[in-house]
Amino acid sequence: MKVLVVYKKSAWELFSRSEDPNVAHFMEQSGRDAQSVEQSHHVQKESMETITSTLIESGAQVSILYRSELSEEVTKNIDLAVTIGGDGTFLETSHFIHEEVPIIGVNSDPSRSVGFLSACNGSEFPDFFSGLDKQPRFNLSRARAKINDKVTGPPILNDILFSNPNPAATTRYRMGEKSFRNSGCLFATAAGSTAWIFQEGCAPLPLENNETLQCYHRGNRNANTSTSNSFSLQSLTRKGRIYIDGEHLSYPLSIGQTLELTTGPSLTVIGDLERKRKTFLTKYNLNM
């Protein structure tokens, strides 16, 4: 079995190499926040060692990759993908994973990361992997974006935002016969319906095999959530942008251009996501 392991660098690794004097000053302090960053680094390193040794001992052919080095080429011909980090690492990896390849998310430090898409943490991975064939699997629907009828970006697992790149500026766009002036338009998949759009006040969607998309107009008083299998939007913003699954991946959507969202290829995720989702929603006195 060919396994691709994708990891994130800890904040301590990134901060300790920064040339920013403010970051350097922060790292030199002995306060609680700086200590927490270093402690998390050791936890994540231990998770990495546990996971990789478990995979190697199983006889798997293991390739290890930093998440910024991901490409379609390196994800070809693999049998399984394992992400070590949090939801951000999982989302970034999902952009390069074909629908026939299963993926496991491992939360490298549960004290600092929610890891909603993670099946287990580092210390739990050996037991989880030994019973891999018995673990639940979910087919999560992804969305596909087109700008002026041209496929743009990777499959979208969580959400996509259209907005002015300046958060203090007005975003202008048209959907059908109606024009909007607000803080941007946020779309989410079923998997993403308990993420950003949920914190905007929208209700979660059922998780598995759900091709429905949600749409929410940010910054409009008493805005309602609409659902559909597809959405179309025309930008009336001169320098608008779309942001896919967070802040790291974006594309321009200039005035006059059209964004179309439809169902894309699904993603096979290993782990009991329904259990984690129910636990999360009980905090808000909600049930699916």
Language model features with spans:
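Catalytic phosphate-donor-binding core of small-molecule kinases
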Residues: 2-9, 24-26, 32, 36-68, ...
